[in-house]
């Protein structure tokens, strides 16, 4: 597997030198300074690539080329925006970059309610608490019909919790949910997110899936010409938020997408933490079934709770069989007759250790020490399984 590291560009508090010292050889990055929907000029792509290569690293994966909401809703200027997206793919291919991660989540990107969840060792993790989310949705945002999106016990728990919150606590919760997390697509204020929700709530899951399929059919010719694998990231979390549709939360969702768009350029990002937040997703089975579509992997673990809440645990601890997943992915690589296939992998998120907790530049989930620790643990698993013989564990 190819060890990679998410880098947010020159303003990232983690330098390229630090990434190399952590042992990664590939970089996962994007041109975040270019507004969503505009073409990425080849000269900008080449400059970013050269910056990475000057540090002795390789730009392995683009994460991501974000999708404008007009594309997701097939409205407004979506035809021009799709044309721009096609041109960006052609330019990336010309620069020798052949893996592009993207997502089709409506309104909010990956979402957490607590960015500083304290663990027993005093390190900090990211947490999604369904009751806290319901507090915001029902009592702060006051979305119409919000109570219908939750079980009665969650609604009552949210009511009681909201009554105990002061204004600073409400503001902090709102900021966590709608201000935008690293790599996410922008941020909202309260009026803005309500307007966006209303814009998307015309779609149920199937109608929204058809928009995704239409987008892929539009861009596949360009992706094929550019020799680019479009690797969709699953919904995070893999269930509806704000009553909005979800179209990539389960193995069945992946099957439907592959069947509708069979092009070899239609690939998958296997995010263990996203898919794994649902107990009915078998990550090892998914790696076996979709191995030929998987070109990028986010290795992360979680601890699930019965009401749908979860927190991000250490990489080798939690409810996901990360060792079994890595074994299955190594078996996928071994089946390649050329012997050249190396699936790009990054340690997805990491705990914030004591030494970084006071750093105001820290991006939630993207500490240096926590990710370096995770990468070292994952590397150890890969080396051990390789020494024992690639393939699935008995």
State the predicted function of each range.
Residues 31, 61-63, 101-106, 234:
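Glycine-rich, histidine-containing beta strand-loop boundary motifs that form or position
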Residues 115-207:
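Extended, charge-rich helix/loop segments that form flexible
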Residues 64-72, 103-112:
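Aromatic-lined carbohydrate-binding surfaces of glycoside hydrolases
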Residues 30-46, 109, 242:
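Glycine-rich, proline-tolerant flexible connector loops at the mouths of alpha/beta enzymes
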């Amino acid at each position: 597997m190819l060890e990679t590291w998410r880098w947010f560009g020159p303003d990232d508090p983690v330098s390229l030198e630090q990434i190399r010292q952590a042992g990664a050889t590939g970089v996962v990055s994007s041109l975040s300074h270019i507004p969503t929907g505009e073409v990425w000029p080849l000269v900008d792509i080449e400059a970013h690539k050269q910056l990475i290569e000057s540090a002795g690293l390789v730009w392995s994966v683009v994460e991501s080329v974000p999708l404008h909401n007009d594309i997701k809703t097939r409205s407004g200027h979506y035809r021009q925006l799709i044309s721009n997206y096609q041109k960006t793919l052609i330019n990336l291919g010309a620069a020798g970059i052949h893996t592009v991660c993207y997502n089709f989540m409506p309104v909010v990107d990956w979402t957490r309610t607590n960015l500083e969840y304290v663990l027993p060792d005093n390190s900090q993790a990211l947490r999604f608490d369904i009751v806290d989310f319901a507090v915001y949705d029902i009592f702060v945002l006051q979305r119409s019909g919000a109570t219908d999106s939750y079980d009665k016990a969650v609604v009552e728990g949210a009511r009681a919790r909201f009554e105990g919150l002061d204004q600073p606590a409400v503001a902090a919760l709102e900021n966590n949910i709608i201000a935008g997390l690293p790599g996410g697509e922008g941020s909202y204020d309260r009026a803005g997110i309500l307007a966006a929700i209303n814009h998307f709530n015309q779609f149920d899951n199937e109608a929204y899936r058809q928009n995704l399929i239409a987008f892929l059919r539009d861009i596949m010719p360009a992706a094929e010409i550019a020799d680019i694998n479009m690797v969709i990231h699953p919904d995070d979390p893999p269930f509806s938020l704000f009553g909005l549709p979800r179209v990539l939360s389960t193995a069945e969702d992946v099957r439907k997408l592959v069947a509708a768009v069979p092009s070899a350029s239609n690939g998958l990002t296997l995010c263990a933490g996203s898919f794994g937040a649902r107990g009915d997703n078998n990550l090892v089975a998914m790696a076996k079934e979709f191995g030929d579509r998987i070109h990028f992997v986010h290795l992360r673990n979680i601890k699930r709770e019965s009401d749908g809440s979860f927190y991000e645990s250490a990489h080798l601890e939690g409810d996901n069989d990360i060792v079994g997943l890595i074994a299955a992915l190594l078996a996928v690589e071994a089946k390649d007759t050329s012997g050249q296939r190396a699936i790009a992998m990054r340690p997805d998120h990491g705990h914030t250790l004591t030494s970084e907790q006071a750093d105001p530049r820290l991006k939630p989930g993207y500490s240096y020490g926590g990710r370096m620790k995770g990468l070292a643990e994952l590397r150890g698993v890969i080396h051990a399984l390789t020494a024992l013989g690639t393939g699935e564990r008995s």
